[in-house]
Amino acid sequence: MAHLEAKPADGTRAGGSRSAGRTGGRILADALKTQGVTHVFQVAGESFLGLLDGLYENRSAIRTITCRFEGAAVNMAEAHGKLTGRPGVAIVTRGPGACHGSIGIHIAQQDSTPLVLLVGQIPRGDMDRDAFQEVDYRNFFGGMAKWVTQIDDAARIPELIHHAFQVAVSGRPGPVVVAIPEDMQTDTAEVPDGRRHTVPRILPDPAAMAEFKRMLGRARRPLVVLGQGAHWTAEGRADLAAWLVANDLPAAVGFRRQGILDNTLPVFVGDLGNGGDPALFAKAKEADLIIAIGSRMGEPVTQGYSLFAPPRLDAPLVHVMPDGGELGRVYQADLPVQADLNAFAAAARATVSVEPRWRGWTSELRANRMKWSGEVPAYEGRLNVAAAMKELSAMLPEDAIVTTDAGNFSAWGVRFINYGPGQKLIGPSCGAMGYSVPAGIAAKVLFPERTVISMVGDGGFLMNGQEIATAFHHGVNPLVMVFNNQMYGTIRMHQERDYPGRVSGTALTNPDFAKFIEAYGGHGEVVQDTAEFRPAVERALAAGKPALVELRMNPDQITTRTTITAMRAAAGLKAKPAKKPDPKKAKPTATSRGRTAKAAKPKKR
């Protein structure tokens, strides 16, 4: 049983004699080790000093990554979950720290990412007094997290931490929040370590697989929709790809899920997310069988529920999800299948094979994808971002990791980069800005030998760009690619659509981003012309230090398909392009080699 009085973290009593057992902080750190944790992402706070001391004792097994902002720390843990399939772990302090970190909980919930957030808490005796930085975490996180608890007894730490990890990976994966009062961390208790959590693997019902085969045999225009990226294993993706190719089944991915399936396969037909191909959206409406595997068929994937209107589709729906609670929640499937996605892929590969009567359909969808991603439009301006992304696609190593932020800029990569079987793309499907830089740092911490590119807009970069300091602190070298169009692009697009020509609150004034990273000691590049892109990226990758490549875009080119000028013309307004920077008033900038040009001396008045 835990002693309720606080004791020094080394386990000694005030009189100098040594007490039995371990401190709560040490038990907690040991419990994380038992659950297989290798990294924790944190911003230090006095409310979890006991845990930090326990992590010091476990420093050979668990690497503590010190971040500069709690929101970024939780984003890093969320990226860990996406990249490994195992729960990422973040630690934040009470009150403000927890509030800052909540964005990562929202991302993990929307993206079905396993994550455990440990939150320092005020002493137990001060509860319900509106004490300094007191927050009721059950109420605060209850609508986003799968489970929220508080550990008040040090003896229960192994039990509750095991359960936290079990909940995070079970069914539909997601975030769990555990509050840890600071005085509990200095209590001592004699308690054995718990068991490591296990990932439940629900096998598909053979009868359901037989019915699925019958439904597939009747189809002429089937379409597979893939989702839930963190749930897939390498083996599962291999089984999935083999089954799709063997049956010539056209497969589209959900919003920011291109990493699930090799984009070079003849059955990959594109992305159903924001900024996707209108031709694919039109064809999706013609499908006579929808096979949703791991996709919740949410708002971005269905284009605001316009492609597939709930609750019942016009075409039969086979819906495969690991959590039975997700089946029938929005869409009433003709064949709901509760199964681990990897187990379903293996079973489908082994048992569901039919003579494809849709080869022409698949070929048409694939041809549309190749046209959409292969043809480089002749955009106005010196820098053709489409050509740059095609160049980047060819440059990426076979095991590259790309992280993306929220914003219109991301559509350029989605359209013009084809991800191979060993490459990964991760990003927030909920539109959370400020994700990509922390996610890229986490990726480089986890996989230091792999090339990591963090793509982010100018708006999103300045939400978490300070985490470049974290990359330097921990000796990792991601490459950040800033798409600079001097505005909150997505919001501006909506603004021009609904209130054409009435620009309000969406324009931005930016620093020299190359100088920004140079101030940290990194390598900066500025790209203003298409021909400058490849050499700049090559220099950045070879720099041996954190690097940043700024792409100075034509602000008028608001999406891959249209301009602000065209949107205003369609609204009946006189064409007036977005304001471009005045070179006479421009601040001194970095050259394409990252060196700083000298500014002209100001004239005397």
Predicted regions and their residues:
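Phosphate/pyrophosphate-binding active-site segments
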Residues: 2-19, 155, 191-193, 214, ...
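N-terminal alpha/beta PP-like core and its mobile active-site loop of ThDP/TPP-dependent enzymes
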Residues: 2-354, 360, 395-398, 470, ...
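Active-site diphosphate/adenylate-binding microenvironment
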Residues: 25-29, 33-35, 46, 51-56, ...
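Active-site nucleophile and cofactor-binding loops and adjacent substrate-binding regions
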Residues: 42-45, 64-75, 90-97, 152-153, ...
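Thiamine diphosphate
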Residues: 118, 127-133, 275, 281-284, ...
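Residues immediately flanking
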Residues: 182, 295, 406, 485, ...
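Active-site/binding-pocket entry motifs
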Residues: 184-186, 408-410, 555
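Conserved short loop/turn motifs at secondary-structure junctions
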Residues: 227-232, 378, 457-459
